[in-house]
Amino acid sequence: MNASVEGDTFSGSMQIPGGTTVLVELAPDIHICGLCKQHFSNLDAFVAHKQSGCQLTTTPVTAPSTVQFVAEETEPATQTTTTTISSETQTITVSAPEFVFEHGYQTYLPTESTDNQTATVISLPTKSRTKKPTAPPAQKRLGCCYPGCQFKTAYGMKDMERHLKIHTGDKPHKCEVCGKCFSRKDKLKTHMRCHTGVKPYKCKTCDYAAADSSSLNKHLRIHSDERPFKCQICPYASRNSSQLTVHLRSHTASVLENDVQKPAGLPAEESDAQQAPAVTLSLEAKERTATLGERTFNCRYPGCHFKTVHGMKDLDRHLRIHTGDKPHKCEFCDKCFSRKDNLTMHMRCHTSVKPHKCHLCDYAAVDSSSLKKHLRIHSDERPYKCQLCPYASRNSSQLTVHLRSHTGDTPFQCWLCSAKFKISSDLKRHMIVHSGEKPFKCEFCDVRCTMKANLKSHIRIKHTFKCLHCAFQGRDRADLLEHSRLHQADHPEKCPECSYSCSNPAALRVHSRVHCTDRPFKCDFCSFDTKRPSSLAKHIDKVHREGAKTENRAPPGKDGPGESGPHHVPNVSTQRAFGCDKCGASFVRDDSLRCHRKQHSDWGENKNSNLVTFPSEGIATGQLGPLVSVGQLESTLEPSHDL
């Protein structure tokens, strides 16, 4: 069969074994749109129509199809038939050699063989023939019909229908496990991986695995240190767009409107190439970002200075501190949290999952921030510096506790006595004294202690430094070594005053002080004097412990830290501007007041009578440092970069 293509029809000839030449002219397939019912004989026009979206129009009336058989033969034709059929008719029967046409293709069933050559011209469409419609332009984009929405798509009505579910709130796809609903089926499939634990997308560099490809792409930027999202106002760059969106809120609205524009003086191609990796802000996004940059959300509770530019969600999370709302509850220990991410971190305590591991040792942490703090131990990095003394710490919480040494803030107070502490762990240990509980038991004897430190001291004194030859027990290794010399056979060093002998000249010099009347080591608090510095240190520790702490004195025989020493902690004189409205306690720093208020919410209102209030002014006595402003003590605990 020789076929040629001319326009939208196909013609050709076929030699039938009976000697009859059949000329066949067929119309191409007609494609019908399933939404608007338009007919297309051109496949390219049909594809362009589906991609650009279709408009619901009235389906044109289909004209009846006409099939005409024209016989051209050398001898008189036996029969010439002209048949008019409707578009619903698909079966054709002729008296000449019979042809059955199915779906635009032809077959022939000869009924008889003859020598006469007959040429039959057949013109038959496979479907209803209509006027060829004009294909919509391929560049046509559908716009959202909701006012104020600038969404446009060139991917047809299905994509537009998915977008309209955002406005209508339609979420037909529901999770069978947790009941969460989604507007798109692919979102539901990705969500189901949270329940099944399937993470098909794995990192080739480390053990990271993700449930979707976008999370893996974000993770790969950590290894490559790629930061494609750049701020057009400052040198800031981030690995994902959400971080850049949050960063843009820190800029004011005026800076956004003036600086986010395309740089002047650059060609169009060069300017577009320069802005390619950055986030392109639409007019609506600029207005929304400018509004967020202008508006600051303040806490409405009196005395709270919390401010945020990150929207109402951030403010709602903060308000839970005041309201005490903790909607997220642990299933194992019934502990409640105000934020879901805190509950997720807490759950790792029960599951023992520690995904963040140190590459220098065997340490593993449940969160990345704990791992960063641990890595500073290896690098000995101390970015948090005190502005009043040379003290530096590895994390902000240590610096916060250290600043209370300057200010004298003790926000953690005992409800049963007047004891006050700088950190909560000290208060917890103190409360065991009132309860009479002794949870720490010695494994060598029946002694029980209220604190773990007391148990360690007991084991060190009673069960560690024992003499192998007698029942002697020393407090430390030095006592045991000194005693062990008594069991040695050779004592070359002998005292000229008595029968004392030893093997060490230094021990003999110490012994010689027994015979002399000079007592050079004297106590500053009483008339006690001694010949040995260790005896004076024991005396001060037992009798004058509180007085030594008040005056910040070093043990006798050791040089105390100078004014510029790393352990020098001067007190400061400043007004206690942050006062508690429930018990009258006042503090220098706001964080101390927050810790104090948390005690009220934890213990209840019926225990406020036992609170010990602070004086309204600064420390009256013992001022060792200069006058310090409150602003200097309220400085944010940001790491210092001048290490």
UniProtKB/Swiss-Prot annotation:
Tissue specificity annotation: Widely expressed. Expressed in the brain, spleen, liver, and heart.
Zinc fingers, C2H2-type class: 173-195, 201-223, 229-251, 297-322, 328-350, 356-378, 384-406, 412-434, 440-463, 465-487, 493-515, 578-600
One GO biological process term: mesenchymal cell differentiation
Quaternary data: Interacts with NOTCH1.
Binding-site positions, Zn(2+) 2: C523, C526, H539, H544
Chain residues that bind Zn(2+) 1: C495, C498, H511, H515
Subcellular location: Nucleus
Matching Pfam families: zf-C2H2
InterPro entries: C2H2-ZF_domain-containing, Znf_C2H2_sf, Znf_C2H2_type
Region (Disordered): 538-571
Keywords, in A-Z order: Developmental protein, DNA-binding, Metal-binding, Nucleus, Repeat, Transcription, Transcription regulation, Zinc, Zinc-finger
Family that this chain belongs to: Belongs to the krueppel C2H2-type zinc-finger protein family.
Free-text function comment from the UniProt entry: May be involved in the regulation of mesenchymal cell differentiation through transactivation of NOTCH1 target genes.
Annotated GO CC locations: nucleus
Basic and acidic residues: bias regions: 538-552
SUPFAM superfamilies hit by this protein: beta-beta-alpha zinc fingers
First and last residue of the signal peptide: none
Name this protein carries in UniProt: Zinc finger protein 64
